[in-house]
Regions:
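Sec-dependent bacterial lipoprotein signal peptides
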Residues: 1-18
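Lipid interaction determinants
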Residues: 20-91, 95-162
Length: 162
């Protein structure tokens, strides 16, 4: 009887140790793909996708935004590519905890082009990337939110749709 109790306790302990982790797999979400800008959005409830709507914009289709992209690497760097040959790198960090899902960029460096000369969507994207504090998403899309969780940019992995 004592052996059964010990065995049962060991199985229960093992189940507790291998239980579900309520955090995101950061590398599988962000790395290994090129993320293309799909649009700029506003929301009243960041947990409810039905509460968001696109901000007015002068682009005609999502293909107009395909030149705006980010590639995240497992070493913690990101390459941001914008029109006019402008490329920047930054360090990125994400916490996949279900309650927080924090995200940040730091240590920006210009690789090519002149970010000061950017206008339109390129300037808007770069300005918003520098204010990103939170994220939501999966391996198909990511949303990068500002500190208020009211404005976000959505990016898509277009290879998933080809």
């Amino acid at each position: 009887m004592a052996n059964r109790c010990i065995s049962l306790l060991m199985v229960l302990c093992l189940a507790c140790l291998t239980g579900c982790d309520r955090s995101d797999d950061i590398e599988s979400i962000f790395t290994g793909k090129v993320w293309h800008l799909a649009g700029f959005y506003q929301t009243t409830d960041w947990d409810n996708p039905n509460m968001s709507h696109p901000l007015q914009s002068d682009y005609n289709s999502h293909s107009d935004l395909s030149a705006y992209n980010i590639t995240f690497f497992t070493d913690g760097t990101a390459l941001i590519a914008l029109p006019q040959g402008c490329q920047l790198t930054a360090l990125w960090a994400a916490d996949g905890n279900e309650r927080h899902r924090t995200f940040s960029f730091s240590e920006w460096k210009t690789v090519s082009g002149d970010p000061a000369r950017l206008g339109g969507h390129a300037k808007q994207m770069l300005d918003q990337l520098k204010r990103v504090s939170y994220y939501q998403g999966n391996s198909y899309y990511i949303q990068l939110f500002d500190d208020s969780k009211r404005y976000f940019m959505q990016f898509a992995d277009l290879s998933k749709y080809n």
